[in-house]
Amino acid sequence: MKRWILILAGLALALAASAQETILDRLKAANTFDTMQLSFVQTRHSALLTKDLVSEGQMVLASPDRIRWEVLKPYPSVFVSSGELTPSGRRFRMPTEKDFTATTLEGEDLTVKLVPVRRDLKSLFREIIVHADKQSLQIRSALLITPDGDWTQLEFKDFVVNRPVDAKLFEKE
């Protein structure tokens, strides 16, 4: 799950590279920030479970590599990363537009289907479908589908961009 959170933080870059050149610049501008705070609802579906798991929380991002992912309910938990090494001892590399092939889909929102190119990402995802608001171009939701068909839907709201963030939020408790 922790890798998924870090990968999500890089989705703005992948989404930005997914469309035509005029959209590309607008998406990059809309999803470039020094800090971002938002609320999320996460729905996880697994063939092994009889019922989907739904959780709610908040995420705080600060450029270039700080993230706080806090689940508030039903089971409170906090994940904090400030550019640390992965368990394998290597620095995590944020995905970029070169790590996915992208297809723009028709619909009410700007919808982009991302298919991973890197082997390590292919082991995590079959595809990622990202929805962005056509006006603001902010990412509103992401559907992450695993190779076995399980999925996680993330819905984002209450965006606050480029406001000061307390550095203590990124300290491990």
Model-assigned labels for residue ranges:
Residues 7-14:
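Bacterial N-terminal signal peptides
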Residues 41-45, 64-66, 72-75, 82-86, ...:
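Solvent-exposed coil/turn segments that connect beta secondary-structure elements
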Residues 92, 96-173:
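Gly/Pro-enriched, hydrophobic low-complexity segments
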Residues 49-59, 104-106, 116:
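A short, surface-exposed loop/turn module that caps and links secondary-structure elements
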Residues 1-4:
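Positively charged n-region of N-terminal signal peptides that target proteins for export
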Residues 15, 19-52, 171-172:
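N-terminal leader/targeting segments and the immediate start of mature chains
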